[in-house]
């Protein structure tokens, strides 16, 4: 099995592709199949979130480009910017991962959120599309102010790979 543990910024060529939906692009340890059919193990730094277009380098030097897979999402539009901002506010208040486009919002399919959005008077359309939600205003993971008081203990990497 091919090991992939390095994210790189540039490459002169791409040797293979890795097509994954967003929920799998959030995992740092993952067993995957590349577009060529090659089985690989992602062993990335904890907290790494892959985005479409990211480049990875395998242990044998191959460069693999990440492709955001089409997945079931809801596309939200509104008659006015205020209505769209109101929908974004209510989704953000629920900590919903959200992709923000020019005049639209995109979120993972959820019938409860769809009903809420329709109740707000916006248009909601189910579609298959790549999902690239905002990374968050503060970057990284969820933290609290008291986290800085605790000693920093680096946990050893586990060898478990998600299927």
Swiss-Prot record:
<keyword id="KW-0143">Chaperone</keyword>
<comment type="similarity">
    <text>Belongs to the UreE family.</text>
</comment>
<protein>
    <recommendedName>
        <fullName>Urease accessory protein UreE</fullName>
    </recommendedName>
</protein>
<dbReference type="InterPro" id="IPR012406">
    <property type="entry name" value="UreE"/>
</dbReference>
<dbReference type="Pfam" id="PF02814">
    <property type="entry name" value="UreE_N"/>
</dbReference>
<comment type="function">
    <text>Involved in urease metallocenter assembly. Binds nickel. Probably functions as a nickel donor during metallocenter assembly.</text>
</comment>
<dbReference type="GO" id="GO:0019627">
    <property type="term" value="P:urea metabolic process"/>
</dbReference>
<keyword id="KW-0963">Cytoplasm</keyword>
<dbReference type="InterPro" id="IPR036118">
    <property type="entry name" value="UreE_N_sf"/>
</dbReference>
<dbReference type="InterPro" id="IPR007864">
    <property type="entry name" value="UreE_C_dom"/>
</dbReference>
<dbReference type="GO" id="GO:0005737">
    <property type="term" value="C:cytoplasm"/>
</dbReference>
<keyword id="KW-0996">Nickel insertion</keyword>
<dbReference type="GO" id="GO:0006457">
    <property type="term" value="P:protein folding"/>
</dbReference>
<dbReference type="GO" id="GO:0065003">
    <property type="term" value="P:protein-containing complex assembly"/>
</dbReference>
<dbReference type="GO" id="GO:0016151">
    <property type="term" value="F:nickel cation binding"/>
</dbReference>
<feature type="region of interest" description="Disordered">
    <location>
        <begin position="134"/>
        <end position="163"/>
    </location>
</feature>
<dbReference type="GO" id="GO:0051082">
    <property type="term" value="F:unfolded protein binding"/>
</dbReference>
<dbReference type="Pfam" id="PF05194">
    <property type="entry name" value="UreE_C"/>
</dbReference>
<dbReference type="InterPro" id="IPR004029">
    <property type="entry name" value="UreE_N"/>
</dbReference>
<keyword id="KW-0533">Nickel</keyword>
């Amino acid at each position: 099995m091919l090991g992939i543990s390095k994210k790189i910024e540039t490459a002169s060529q791409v040797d293979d592709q890795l097509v994954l939906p967003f929920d799998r692009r959030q995992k740092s340890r993952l067993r995957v199949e590349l577009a060529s059919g090659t089985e690989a193990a992602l062993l990335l730094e904890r907290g790494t979130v892959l985005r479409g277009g990211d480049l990875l380098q395998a242990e044998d030097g191959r460069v693999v480009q990440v492709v955001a897979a089409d997945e079931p999402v809801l596309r939200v539009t509104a008659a006015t910017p205020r209505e769209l901002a109101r929908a974004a506010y209510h989704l953000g208040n629920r900590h919903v991962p959200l992709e923000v486009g020019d005049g639209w919002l995109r979120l993972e399919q959820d019938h409860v959120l769809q009903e809420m959005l329709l109740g707000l008077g916006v248009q909601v359309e189910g579609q298959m599309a790549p999902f690239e939600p905002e990374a968050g205003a503060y970057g990284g993971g969820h933290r609290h102010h008291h986290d800085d008081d605790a000693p920093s203990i680096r946990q050893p990497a586990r060898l478990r790979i998600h299927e």
